[in-house]
Amino acid sequence: MENAHAFPPALCKRLVGAGAIAVLVIDNVDHAVRVAEALWKGGVEIAEVTMRTPSAAESLALICKELPEMLPVAGTVLTPAQVDDAIDSGAAMAVAPGLQQETLRHAQQRGLPFAPGVLTPTEIEKAITLGCQTLKFFPAATGGGLPFLKSVAAPYQHLDLKFLPTGSISEDAMENYLAFPATMAVGGSWIAPRALIQGEDWEEITRRAQRARKIVDAIRREG
């Protein structure tokens, strides 16, 4: 395995400590800072802004500017152009639902930590050959859940792969994913779903963030 493209130790430590990644779909740029503030108030330190809407790049840039203490992640990064957008917006890292070699290589060349999406052993091995050690496990819940992740991760334990399980993971399931040693952090849209953002229900988002933080803290104390 190539090690040149491994995530920096400081970033890995931040991901593990934070534990929860709020996966966001932001339609209105005016909501960007408000939702980030609500998450931070509740104890969630990582905001993944999915690059699915016209306002995504600007929203990510605003979060980076107004809440520099947060860890900004660009999500659903599918093309080299979106890699450039993520970097220009200030993203600390990027993730994707799948693995596009051209996009991954561009991120590596530009120095942006990038976790491609994988589900099967074949996809994991392709990511390994391309120098990846931190992988997004997607779609986690519908793709077999934690039992499947444990099974596909087992043959690669000696490579110290780390996973970011994401995709329909419920609040109740989050604890078990975090307890798995190969899990670095868990992504969840339940913390700040699109409907709550559109409805500007910042208090409810903060309450959900607090619950996520409580789950992370409980697991980290046990570990």
Give residue spans per PLM region:
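Catalytic beta/alpha-barrel core
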Residues: 23-25, 45-53, 70-78, 83, ...
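Glycine-rich phosphate-binding active-site loops on the catalytic face of alpha/beta enzymes
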Residues: 93-106, 136-146, 181-204
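Active-site phosphate/pyrophosphate- and oxyanion-stabilizing loops and adjacent acidic/basic residues
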Residues: 61, 150-153, 175, 210
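Catalytic cores of alpha/beta
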Residues: 35, 79-89, 122-130, 153, ...
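Glycine-rich beta-strand-to-loop/alpha-helix junction loops that act as flexible
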Residues: 74-75, 164-169, 186-189
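A contiguous pocket-lining binding segment that forms or flanks enzyme active sites
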Residues: 127, 131-138, 147-149, 155-161
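Conserved N-terminal beta1-alpha1 strand-loop-helix module at the mouth
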Residues: 1-90, 109, 179, 199-222
